[in-house]
Amino acid sequence: MGIEFKRSPRPTLGVEWEIALVDPETRDLAPRAAEILEIVAKNHPEVHLEREFLQNTVELVTGVCDTVPEAVAELSHDLDALKEAADSLGLRLWTSGSHPFSDFRENPVSEKGSYDEIIARTQYWGNQMLIWGIHVHVGISHEDRVWPIINALLTNYPHLLALSASSPAWDGLDTGYASNRTMLYQQLPTAGLPYQFQSWDEWCSYMADQDKSGVINHTGSMHFDIRPASKWGTIEVRVADSTSNLRELSAIVALTHCLVVHYDRMIDAGEELPSLQQWHVSENKWRAARYGLDAEIIISRDTDEAMVQDELRRLVAQLMPLANELGCARELELVLEILERGGGYERQRRVFKETGSWKAAVDLACDELNDLKALD
């Protein structure tokens, strides 16, 4: 089973951002995405929105962009159109990695054959997917580069997750995790960490096996945390919890863009890309999901360890010259701002401890969507 990879001549960028609707009185999720899509399509036909797995969610999707500021500006414009539609229905926009108390039984799945198939196959766990994320696409020039870069990106998995983690609560309980979304999503049979394939042919062989065994027939595709998007000629990084605001999204997209281009240029220079044993990658994923920005992570094949905050500061300094070249230096600097402000999970947990109510945490995320704006 050969898979054609639509090669991208330059490291273009695309971003998908999942946003939910909430009732301002109950703070619970509101399954009214179909109405929102209709209003936006009528009033702002230039805005690209997609319906999502849940009827309470819409996805903002950029076009093909060359820079982080371009992608963020497009998302900002689309967010304004989405807010206008939500206001007209008396709803608020909200997003984080997961909702702190909503009941999956009150949140219907969108009407789509592939969604029905996923629920039929995965049952309880499929119904639990009250989760939201950010997907970042970066263009790759040749399929032979895809898996070396993905395997290198897996060494940065905990950095991206800790920075974005915003799902500390579930079913009204503090889970003790920074990203409960991460723990939930990996319950689906085609989700979670990718295998560290060593070549494009090996990936094609794997996908042929999944097709022959009926796995792809059931799910439509593999939903790995980082995966090739052959149709677009990109690597799609799906690690991050959804951020409650464009400002933090900007930082995560900038870091992702810089990392992919950095590893691509290492290939150009004939340098060996970093990698970790699969068990180290898995452990790092768990540590970042559990401890967020307080995680101590494994940084070498010799099992050396460091604090993820220190590693993030090191990465920002290392990547800053490249960020200047790519036009996203200011956005990359926002990584340091997140470290100072505290992660989304920390802010939600803090307001819950102050008020004793997860409704206040929902309000916080709604307010941040309005107040923590992208850079001018």
Curated annotation (Swiss-Prot):
Keyword match Protein biosynthesis: no
UniProt-listed Pfam families: GCS2
SUPFAM superfamilies per record: Glutamine synthetase/guanido kinase
Enzyme class, spelled out: ligase
E.C. code: 6.3.2.2
Catalysed reaction equations from the record: L-cysteine + L-glutamate + ATP = gamma-L-glutamyl-L-cysteine + ADP + phosphate + H(+)
Keywords, ordered alphabetically: ATP-binding, Ligase, Nucleotide-binding
GO MF terms held by the record: ATP binding; glutamate-cysteine ligase activity
Superkingdom field: Bacteria
One GO process term, biological-process aspect: modified amino acid biosynthetic process
Function comment: ATP-dependent carboxylate-amine ligase which exhibits weak glutamate--cysteine ligase activity.
HAMAP family, per the entry: Glu_cys_ligase_2 (MF_01609)
Protein family: Belongs to the glutamate--cysteine ligase type 2 family. YbdK subfamily.
NCBIfam families: gshA_cyan_rel, PRK13517.1-2, PRK13517.1-4
Protein name: Putative glutamate--cysteine ligase 2
Species annotation: Corynebacterium glutamicum (strain ATCC 13032 / DSM 20300 / JCM 1318 / BCRC 11384 / CCUG 27702 / LMG 3730 / NBRC 12168 / NCIMB 10025 / NRRL B-2784 / 534)
